[in-house]
């Protein structure tokens, strides 16, 4: 078991309480698996379970699909889950339960497998058998009819030249699962609404537009669809068109570009899940809003319900700001009531959105492109600007880079010219890494230089 516990600690640039807790559990042959873990933590746990060194694994549905992790026995304790639309616990779908049970006794791994569902009484036992063992699975339904999906896919079809008229659009949609399930006529108003949005926000142009919710068949040919340069760029970046519009509005704002304003902008997009602001935190974040409003590139909404979501996005932006200011991960977990996996997921998505923003800025506000690109790299690594040159060195993350910088090694050349014994004394470096770092050859080109 030492192999896995060693990988947990040595492979981390920053060891957190989650690593310590997992280490204690793995030493006893058990572990847990959920979306709050980092990719590194999940990979180590999956490896240990696959190699049968970890005997029991407690998991959320993260293991239900997409991970080839067979088990001799799968036990499902809870058969309900909270559903916010019903404001109550609802039964898990048959398809999801069968997907979980499918992990037991996989061909090529076991001769047989066991799937166990826990019933609290005989009545529930009968219900479980009828529903999950003898019942039919739910039908697969198309999600193309939702506005976010329609926005993204219609723009993509137009930008790629797959469709160029509304007639071709309807013909294409009829051949999808969405069309085959007969949903097209039910959502015609939504399709028209999405087209209006794309046109209004300068993502597409519609020539020969016919007013009215329902378009006569003989008029559809005359409506030609064409993506604008902005629409093509948004489609190429594969972000929600609404995200592109939000980013453009921020870049066109009179507020000078700044790190908090840029991070709050990407937090406002539908492509990132924002942190929830609890009732007892509301006053705190309202205070933050009053103190920081001058730096925010998107003004707060007037409506109270919208203001609540605005504060969620502000909380997310502040988490990202703390990340690039090198706040220890353990402090971030406590301050924002989150997990290492959630932090990494936010950081990864933020990096992608900042890249998209830098690409869009070339069309909207070229003067801000360099600032955004720099912030993207800082987000990806969680560092202040001064550490950027050190991050180009292999095996150096944000914590080791800070240790090197604080010890006086502020450039790649100073590290290269150092003695291994000098480097090994720095926290987080050690003898092996010190030998590797000392005497490194100059890279062909440095991306960042301290000035």
Language model segments and positions:
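Alpha-helix C-terminal capping/helix-coil junction sites
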Residues: 49, 199-200, 405, 424
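C-terminal helical accessory/scaffold domains
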Residues: 192-201, 205, 210, 215-392, ...
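C-terminal or mid-to-C-terminal helical accessory/interaction module adjacent to the motor/catalytic core
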Residues: 111-192, 210, 388, 394
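Acidic, low-complexity intrinsically disordered tails
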Residues: 443-451
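A short beta-strand element within the Helicase C-terminal
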Residues: 56, 63-80, 114-118
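Conserved segment of the helicase C-terminal RecA-like domain
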Residues: 80, 90-131
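Conserved C-terminal RecA-like helicase domain
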Residues: 1-51, 56, 84, 89-95
């Amino acid at each position: 078991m030492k192999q896995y516990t060693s990988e947990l600690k040595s492979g981390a640039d920053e060891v957190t309480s989650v690593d310590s807790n997992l280490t204690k559990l793995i030493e006893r042959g058990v572990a847990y698996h959920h979306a709050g873990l980092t990719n590194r933590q999940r990979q180590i746990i999956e490896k240990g379970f696959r190699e049968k060194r970890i005997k029991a694994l407690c998991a959320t549905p993260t293991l239900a699909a997409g991970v080839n992790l067979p088990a001799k026995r799968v036990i499902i304790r809870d058969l309900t889950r909270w559903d916010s639309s019903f404001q109550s616990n609802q039964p898990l779908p048959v398809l999801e339960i069968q997907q979980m049970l499918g992990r037991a006794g996989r061909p090529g791994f076991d001769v047989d497998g066991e799937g166990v569902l826990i019933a609290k009484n005989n009545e529930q036992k009968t219900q479980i058998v009828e529903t999950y063992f003898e019942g039919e699975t739910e039908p697969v339904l198309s999600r193309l009819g939702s506005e976010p999906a329609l926005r993204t896919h219609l723009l993509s079809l137009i930008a790629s030249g797959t469709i160029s008229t509304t007639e071709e659009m309807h013909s294409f949609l009829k051949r999808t699962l969405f069309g085959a399930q007969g949903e097209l006529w039910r959502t015609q108003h939504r399709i028209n609404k999405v087209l209006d949005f794309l046109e209004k926000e300068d993502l597409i142009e519609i020539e020969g537009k016919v007013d009215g919710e329902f378009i006569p068949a003989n008029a559809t040919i005359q409506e030609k669809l064409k993506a604008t340069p902005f629409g093509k760029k948004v489609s190429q970046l594969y972000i929600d068109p609404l995200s592109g519009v939000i980013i453009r509005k921020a870049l066109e704002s009179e507020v000078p570009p700044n790190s908090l304003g840029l991070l709050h902008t990407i937090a406002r997009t539908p492509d990132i899940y924002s942190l929830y602001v609890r009732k007892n935190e509301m006053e705190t974040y309202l205070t933050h809003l009053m103190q920081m409003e001058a730096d925010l590139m998107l003004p707060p909404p007037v409506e109270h319900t919208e203001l609540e979501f605005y504060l969620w996005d502000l909380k997310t932006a502040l988490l990202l700001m703390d990340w690039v200011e090198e706040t220890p991960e353990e402090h971030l977990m406590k301050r924002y009531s989150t997990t290492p996996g959630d932090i990494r997921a936010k950081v990864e998505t933020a990096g992608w959105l900042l890249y998209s923003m830098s690409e869009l800025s070339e069309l909207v506000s070229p003067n801000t492109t360099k600032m955004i690109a720099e912030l993207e790299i800082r987000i990806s690594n969680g560092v202040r600007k001064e550490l950027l040159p050190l991050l180009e060195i292999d095996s150096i993350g944000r914590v080791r880079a800070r240790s090197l910088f604080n010890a006086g090694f502020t450039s790649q050349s100073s590290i290269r010219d150092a003695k291994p014994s000098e480097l090994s004394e720095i926290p987080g470096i050690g003898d092996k890494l010190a030998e590797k770092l000392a005497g490194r050859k100059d890279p062909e080109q440095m991306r960042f230089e301290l000035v």
